[in-house]
A protein has these predicted regions:
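Residues within membrane-spanning alpha-helices of integral membrane proteins
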Residues: 15, 58, 113-117, 121, ...
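Membrane-interface alpha-helices at helix entry/exit sites of multi-pass transporters
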Residues: 48-57, 80-85, 183-194
Length: 276
């Protein structure tokens, strides 16, 4: 396992760059998700192996999701006592997914992911009134916990340790569940999504710690950046609400879809464009 001595293997300038990348990622992630699109490439550009980059990314991502969660709890938007079942099911789901992915070939599922992310973006794009205000709740208790916590948590855990960028749009899935099934407005749904994001991030981090791949010192520097960026983004979630969150989710979904499509079919796309 890497020690805090790894801090001295990275130049102060590079650490500063990673800190600000993490701050920007935390800001974006707290509003619409997708921060890993910035942090994973930055960590790999800094010279980390893919395994170390994914593990360290999970550490720093915990800073952002925990920061946002703390802010929303203090503002009394989220009540931990009301979310105990959702937290438990998310943790169980994320750990189950992370364990299962070690024994299952996920190639077919990866082909479906861009379509899922595109559908999320289109759904928010074509439903301008979605999450504008609270609506009647459709699902309660254990059924909701199984869907929002168990299923999305499993999805997040299944793809998270394997690919780094995944589960792509997990935060958007959480938010969508709170909007469509709980009837929350989009700001309130995003706040609750951060709580479940934090839960699945912690579950994923525990597995990476057991694997001994986390670069702790660099990860903690980025964690501080994530914490600060997420705090700023969380304030905007409550002050701007649906008017900010909806277009951000659409943009992040579009960028993430393009990234997923390129990862899966990059050579074919370049050949079709006559660039290869």
């Amino acid at each position: 396992m890497e020690t805090f001595n790894s801090l001295f293997m990275v130049s102060p300038l590079l650490l500063g760059v990673l800190f600000f990348v993490a701050m920007l990622a935390g800001f974006i992630d707290s509003i619409a998700g997708g921060g890993g699109l910035l942090t994973i490439p930055a960590l790999m550009a800094a010279g980390m192996s893919p395994a170390n980059a994914l593990a360290t990314n999970k550490l720093q991502a915990c800073g952002g999701s925990i920061s946002a969660t703390i802010y929303f709890i203090r503002r009394k938007v989220v009540s931990l006592s009301d979310q105990k079942l959702n937290i438990a099911m998310t943790f169980v789901g994320s750990m189950s997914g992370a364990l299962l992915v070690q024994y299952v070939q996920a190639d077919v599922l990866r082909q479906i992911l861009p379509i899922l992310v595109i559908c999320i973006g289109l759904y928010f794009l074509l439903m301008p009134k979605l999450g504008e205000e609270d609506r009647q709740r459709r699902m309660y208790g254990l059924p909701f916990a199984l869907v929002a916590g168990g299923c999305v948590g499993f999805y997040d855990g299944f793809f998270g340790p394997a690919d780094g960028f995944f589960g792509p749009a997990a935060g958007s899935f959480y938010a969508l569940a709170f909007v469509t099934l709980c009837g929350f407005n989009l700001a309130k749904a995003t706040a609750h999504a951060k709580l479940l994001n934090a839960t699945s991030n912690i579950g994923g981090l525990l597995l990476f710690i057991l694997g001994g791949k986390v670069i702790w010192a660099t990860g903690f520097v980025m964690l501080v950046g994530q914490f600060l960026g997420a705090r700023m983004g969380s304030r905007l979630v409550l002050s701007k609400g649906q008017k900010l969150i909806r277009p951000m989710i659409v943009i992040v979904s579009a960028v993430m879809s393009a990234k997923l499509l390129y990862d899966s079919h990059g050579q074919e796309i370049l050949h079709w464009l006559g660039m290869n």
